[in-house]
Amino acid sequence: MSWLRTSPLRQSLTRNSGGNGSGGSGNSGNASATVRQRPIDAATDCDPRACYDSFCKHWQQAHEIIQHAGPPTHDDVLGVVSHLDYMVTLLLVELHHCNKVSLPTADAAPPTAPCLEYLLSENLLDKLYEWASTTGRYANAVRLEQLKLYELLVSHSRHQLLCHEPFLRPLLKILASSQGEIFPPDLEKRLVILLNQLCVVLMQNVHLLDLFFFSAQTQVQEQIQNGSLAAPKSGTTTNFIIFSLLIPYVHREGSLGHQARDALLLCMALSQKNSNIGHYIAQYSSICPLLVTGLGGLYSRLPNSIEVSAIDWHRITPDDVAEIPELTLFMNALEFCNAVVQVAHEMIKQQLLDFMYQGFIVPVLGPAILQTLKGKHFQTNIDSQISAMSYLDLILRSITEPGLMRAFVKFLLDTEKFDGERILDALVERLHSPDANLCMVTMALFDTLLGLHCEDLMLELLLKYMLPGKHVPISHRHKINKIDPYLNTTEFFLELTPDVMKRARDLARPKSVHELVDPGAALSSTMLPSLPSPVMSKTIGANWNYYGHYTGDSLYANIQAYLFEAHSRIAQCQRDCGKWANNYRYQKWPRQGQVRATSHALELARQFFSEFGTATPVAVAAVASSELGEKQLDSLQSIGESSGYESFKWRPDDADANDATTTTATSDPDVEHNNSSNHNNSSINSSGRRDLWRVSHSARNEILLTDLDFSEDLFAQGTVNLGPFLNAIWGKLQTFTSNSLYVNLHLTGLITRLAWYPLPLIHSLLLRSDIAITSDTPSFHQVLRMLKQQIDAELPVAENSLEIIDVARSSLIDREFRLINARKVSDNSPLHQQHHQQQQLQHTTNSTHQQQQAQQRSTYATLSAATPMHATPTSAYDPFRRSDNKRRSISASISNIFGRKSTSSTAAANPNPASSGLSQIYAFFTGAASTLVGGINGEVNSRGVAQENPRGNTCETSLSTTPRLDAQATSASSTNSSIGGSTQTLSATHSSSTLHGVESGPQTASFNSEPVSMDSVASMGIIANTSGTERSRDLALCAVLLDEWLKELAAIALEQSVVLVTEQLL
């Protein structure tokens, strides 16, 4: 927002030629008939005396016309306007001359402005206003010239003239007379420009604010007494006239609305510096209800169904906002509300937040998301649900103020406004949707919610189901905070790689290096089925030199890239989670407080045994002896740090527990406790409601987690529920091999985001393979094992499988490079730069990071480390052979490939079909031109129409960097991605990683049209392969994606162990 920008000044003025306008009105009218251009040059030297004489002469002639008896005629008005136009020109020349004078010295007098002094001394502005009020139907024309004159004087003289009564008084008169009037567009534009300039001057000279505010009040009172202005309906004469005149233009389109909103924001900022302004806006203006009702009206105009052509579309991008006019207006209003909350007085801020929640969020967004009308659910199609959730996701990514964010978090968790139904629960239910588009939009929304790092949301989604610790067996709970198993988990994830991926990696590695680096793998590879030694090709990525990239810049199989990404994401998450009110991690008794902790455990043991009425002197004696330092074995292996039985159960709020907690906290200052929260309720709904959606450090405390909670049955059997959110995620993961590629990318990205949280509780589910889970669903690691077994069974290590794996990897690398270059093109577009300024840039793309690292680290220069070579047993392709001297574009290469009439004619015309990387991919297939069919695995699309005819929609989702690009407009959104999809933001600024797809308009079935992307073709299984079925091709994509995701999880586990070590050292 350009809050302090000044209005653009006139660079040239249209002036009248002909007569001087002397005499009567007839001559004046003839003089204004001929028009000539008369540009004003600031460097033009002029005689100040001649300018002054000419200025006085024009005013005398205009004054003669004003003094005429009777109502003004058309010629009279034209004459006065003509003379006033010349006076404005002379004033502009004089002011330019005054402004360009060098810096004054101590004894130098300020430059004189005789024309301006004459204007003020003769009270010309007041006389002109009084005459303009009698012009009748010509009032707007005269008012326009007056506004031009005031605009000129304010813009050049800054604040000096506001202190002069001959200038301020007529200015307030003309502003007061403009209230409640409907003006033509040109007059509205001049009025808003003048008001904007006045706000800028007042912002820079706050000491004039009280004078202007109370002068406006006095002026209104005088006009009411004179009868020229009706008394306000509110019964008060208090009026900040600049603000009141700007309110009607707050929802206007175009530059007029932008300037009005900028001026209103300046008034809001002034309210923090002057309590009178804040009190007036909050008590006597209607700006807050007007903003909220306007926002609701603009939301109702949004399309009920968003037309998308890409099968991987999952969220609204800045390009979509620019292409939908209704959405553009809505986002302007939302950003303005966000800015008002940021800069306004506390009274205004609180009033706007209350109106937003009660007037827009609950009554408008709630029914739209829940698809309800008057409390009853109504039948809707998938498209309306997708659009409503996309709008909510866009809103959450656009707002930045904690107050607004807190209102939306409360909205998601509120159970009173929607008859006991929570918005968050409804969103979780949609994760089970069989519709791929709705599922992707829902996962993108949850990715945004998890990216907020909000304690209340995490508590409701995961932590409240994990805090009791019952998902971990008692015998395993002592392992939660251990660091060594994280390194073992890294090996565990790498071992889960499908066998076909291991075999492909072994074949791609040179034998000498293979035996030198991993001699153990050579032994294990002998256990695999023997295959004929294929003719190995170089990495396909290295062949695509027309991208202008070296293959080592690819993120495929680049463990350094995953480590870099994991480190930055975990660090950011750790900073945000450090502001939480509670520390959700397993907490053992500190060593320095071991004596006090053991005494507390002894008291708990006595209470426990007293409930059964059984004396246990052995156990009590054992604990007592441990206080004296004696090492004895407890008869009941539940007390003591070394027993290994720990619980996450929160401390009960009874008097004894509170007394014990107080005693412990008093004796040990290093351990902080919190007994005011209840883990079953979100803090947004609890009695101790916090004001911030992400709690500050001042409110930080830690939850006391004891070594043992005796309220838990030690011999209880059965499983526990991890909550609907994790159950839905695990359910989707179990159908990994049946999901589409884009659903799997979002799914892996969502789980990856959870793994970034520096919480050992979450790590016990995701990153700790040595901890057993007693949930009612298969654990995360069990699901991964099942996926490996399924892929190994259905995609055995064979020559055909290796070919399909090679094609799958090649197509993903192909898409990565194309999208990197598409993003570079879009970064230079004006649309991208505009949205880049509107939001915070949270993170650059992974590919850009790695390209910079490639220039600094020698490890990235190693070809085999960055992108392993691919096994292509049937290809004799040499990647270093070139038949042309120029680098070609991707679109031309694809068009040349698919523009051939037949495979046989192609082979005959080009005996060396491996002139590009895509040619090698194309050589793997036969009959591709005749076997293109639409749809995903024969299913219907999201619109309910069967995809029988081929469409040329280029739909892509990259493993590394996947901005959404319009193939014809060549513009992409500023988003970032990592393997499996990572964070999402706008930001502009803000931003965040998404899995956008490249889309183009509908095309014909001819290959002369826009081609289908290799990745979308492969993911839909519509390329016929001589040696593979559609199911095998889908499994190949799943295997490649799973392999890369396991590497990313291994990198996260490694970085999380570093974080834990650092915390202990600090």
UniProtKB/Swiss-Prot annotation:
Organism placement in taxonomy:
Eukaryota, Metazoa, Ecdysozoa, Arthropoda, Hexapoda
**Sequence positions bearing Phosphoserine:** 512, 829
Regions of compositional bias (Low complexity) in chain numbering: 658-687, 836-856, 967-996
The record's keywords, sorted A to Z, are:
Phosphoprotein
According to the UniProt record, where is the region Disordered? 1-33, 647-688, 827-885, 942-1010
Enumerate composition-biased segments (Polar residues): 1-15, 950-963, 1001-1010
Question: What Pfam families does the record tag this protein with?
Answer: DUF5917, KELAA, RAI16-like
Which superkingdom? Eukaryota
Biological source species: Drosophila grimshawi
Which segments show compositional bias classed as Gly residues? 18-27
Name listed for the protein in its UniProt record: FHIP family protein GH13096
* Family of the protein in this entry: Belongs to the FHIP family.
InterPro entries from the UniProt entry: FHIP, FHIP_C, FHIP_KELAA_motif
State whether keyword Phosphoprotein applies: yes
